From Swiss-Prot:
One GO term of the biological process aspect: mitochondrial respirasome assembly
Highest taxon, organism lineage: Eukaryota
Membrane topology: Multi-pass membrane protein
Protein name: Respiratory supercomplex factor 1, mitochondrial
Keyword Transmembrane helix: yes
Complexes and interactors: Associates with the respiratory chain complex III/complex IV supercomplex.
Function statement: Cytochrome c oxidase subunit which plays a role in assembly of respiratory supercomplexes.
GO annotation, cellular component aspect: mitochondrial membrane
Organism: Blastomyces gilchristii (strain SLH14081)
Ranges of residues in domain HIG1: 9-100
Coiled coil start-end: 89-148
Length: 148
């Protein structure tokens, strides 16, 4: 039976209001807020690569080597931010995966229930048609007996 008033059904995740079905952009913004150091590391690495490219075009080997070292530091910073964020947010990610799994199971169950309801409706229509058809045959046989 569909939820008519569109209020959410009670769930074991009610204690965690941060869990909800989110769009891709909501997920990106949430992840940027959770781990702001990773994009900073990406930006630092990209900037170092851009400066290295400019130095290479200008044939400035000292600046080129300095920017390659800066790129390595940017990579190290980004890797550290990824590992530290993974450790720090590991439990929350586990809870989110459990929530997404439960949500998928709920959606699958709703699809199965809708499919079963559709089959029941079709079965009822088929039985009604057979009853009407049988009643019409009986009426035709009785009319034939009366005439003949």
């Amino acid at each position: 039976m569909p939820n008519i008033d569109n209020t959410p059904l009670p769930s074991s995740f009610d204690a965690h209001p941060e869990f909800f079905q989110e769009t891709k952009w909501q997920k990106v913004t949430r992840r940027l807020k959770e781990e702001p150091l990773i994009p900073i590391g990406y930006a630092a690495t990209s900037y170092a690569l851009w400066r290295a490219y400019k130095s290479m075009k200008a044939r400035d080997s000292v600046e080129l080597n300095r920017m390659f070292r800066a790129r390595i530091y940017g990579h190290a910073f980004t890797l550290f931010a990824i590992v530290a964020g993974g450790i720090y947010y590991g439990q929350e990610r586990k809870q989110r995966k459990e929530f997404e799994k439960a949500l998928q199971e709920k959606q699958d169950q709703e699809k199965r229930d809708a499919w079963l309801r559709e089959l029941e409706v079709r079965d009822k229509e088929d039985k009604d048609w057979r009853q009407r058809h049988a009643a019409m045959e009986m009426a035709a046989k009785e009319a034939e007996k009366k005439m003949g």
